Curated annotation (Swiss-Prot):
Keywords associated with the record: Flavoprotein, FMN, Monooxygenase, Oxidoreductase
Catalytic activity: an alkanesulfonate + FMNH2 + O2 = an aldehyde + FMN + sulfite + H2O + 2 H(+)
Function summary: Catalyzes the desulfonation of aliphatic sulfonates.
A Pfam match: Bac_luciferase
Transferase as UniProt keyword: no
SUPFAM superfamilies: Bacterial luciferase-like
Record organism: Pseudomonas putida (strain GB-1)
The enzyme's E.C. designation: 1.14.14.5
Sample GO molecular function, one term: alkanesulfonate monooxygenase activity
Protein name, entry field: Alkanesulfonate monooxygenase
Family: Belongs to the SsuD family.
């Protein structure tokens, strides 16, 4: 099976070490462009652009990198409750047209109550998933060209529609990750690709089986992906030494403060990540070659595959055998590590190389709109 391999744009910061300003690297637009162009040339299929108050806006970053890349796809965040589903559908179609069909969308419900309150979203975990289901139902139908009336518990729209369609038909794919039962129900009903963070294979297999069963009950099939860091070197010894260096400047106080901050999250996935290491820097290899050191201070994806090229490839194939076809990787610093992954890991995998887009994007295919929603007539129709 050919694998889709994505990289990551560190819009929240980058560096050689975790939890310290030593070795930190300024992340400006030029640096993000370097990483995006490297990923494009090295054969990565796309890049995940993170979202949240610690990150630059993923949509603006993606739009700014369209002109300087050729094949690379951009996986950007949809934020239910933060924006209307109709407006989000218009934005999605525009990004897809401007990128010539290189837009992908990642549904993010949020997990930090403090951040969500700051964004004006005052819903609990269950309510957010209710709102996300309503959002996604509307977003999908609008992008697929339907006129939508919807009267939900959290969202109501009347006459929602899209005048300029996306390049990808019937619409760009929707990605989503979540570990709670409500999240799995949403994935089974609404998304094309279900993402998990890098838990041990046995735990990932259990989640895949649960989502598959729920999707089958609705007559659907869902693809699967996984989000992991990678520390790959020419030898296993060098790789493990690099892992140790990555957290070599972390002190107990920094770890304690990071874990206290992450503990307020109501995300089940974040809780599962934290349980892998328990805030303890001892015994961080939680499964063969799966290292939880990143999660000591980082929210979200907190594990890395560590080893030489053949060893990491063997672990990737273990996940692939579970049904995963998409791997979203990252590494510190992200520019150099993109080359290491491509040079040391890709030769041991069947990597699906992205194709050059064949059709041109457009803004308006039929001239200027009349009034607000009337298509202009040709002379022969007059």
């Amino acid at each position: 099976m050919s694998l889709n391999i994505f990289w990551f744009l560190p819009t929240h910061g980058d560096g050689k070490y975790l939890g310290t300003s030593d070795g930190a690297r300024a992340v400006d637009h030029g640096y993000l462009q370097q990483i995006a162009q490297a990923a494009d040339r090295l054969g990565f299929g796309g890049v995940l652009i993170p979202t949240g108050r610690s990150c630059e806006d993923s949509w603006l970053v993606a739009a700014s990198l369209i002109p300087v890349t050729q094949r690379l796809k951009f996986l950007v965040a949809l934020r239910p409750g933060i924006i209307s589903p109709t407006v989000a559908a218009r934005q999605a179609a525009t990004l897809d047209r401007l990128s010539n069909g290189r837009a992908l969308f990642n549904l993010v419900t949020g997990g930090d109550p403090d951040e969500l309150a700051g964004d004006g979203l005052h819903l609990n975990h269950q309510e957010r998933y209710e709102a996300s289901v309503e959002f996604t139902r509307i977003w999908r139908k609008v992008l697929e060209g339907e006129n939508v009336d919807y009267d939900g518990k959290h969202i109501q729209v009347k006459g929602a529609k899209l005048l300029y369609p996306p390049i990808q038909q019937p619409r760009p794919p929707l990605y989503f990750g979540g570990s709670s039962e409500a999240a799995q129900d949403l994935a089974a009903e609404q998304v094309e690709l279900y993402l998990t963070w890098g838990e041990p294979p046995s735990a990932v297999a259990e989640k895949i089986a649960q989502v598959r069963e729920k999707a089958a009950a609705q007559g659907r099939e869902v693809r699967f992906g996984i989000r992991l860091h990678v520390i790959v070197r020419e030898t296993n010894e060098e790789a493990w030494a690099a892992a140790d260096r990555l957290i070599s400047h972390l002190d107990d106080d920094t770890i304690s403060r990071a874990q206290a901050s992450l503990a307020r999250f109501d995300s089940v996935g974040q809780q599962r990540m934290a349980a892998l290491h328990g805030g303890n820097r001892d015994n961080l290899e939680v499964s063969p070659n799966l290292w939880a050191g990143v999660g000591l201070v980082r929210g979200g994806a907190g594990t890395a595959l560590v080893g030489d090229g053949p060893t990491v490839a063997a672990r990737v194939k273990e996940y692939a055998e579970l049904g995963i076809d998409t791997f979203i990787f990252s590494g510190y610093p992200h520019l150099e590590e993109s080359y290491r992954v491509a040079e040391l890991l890709f030769p041991h995998l069947d990597v699906q190389r992205p194709e050059q887009p064949k059709t041109g994007g457009y803004v308006s295919p039929f001239g200027e709109m009349v009034a607000n929603d009337i298509l202009p007539k040709s002379v022969s129709q007059s």
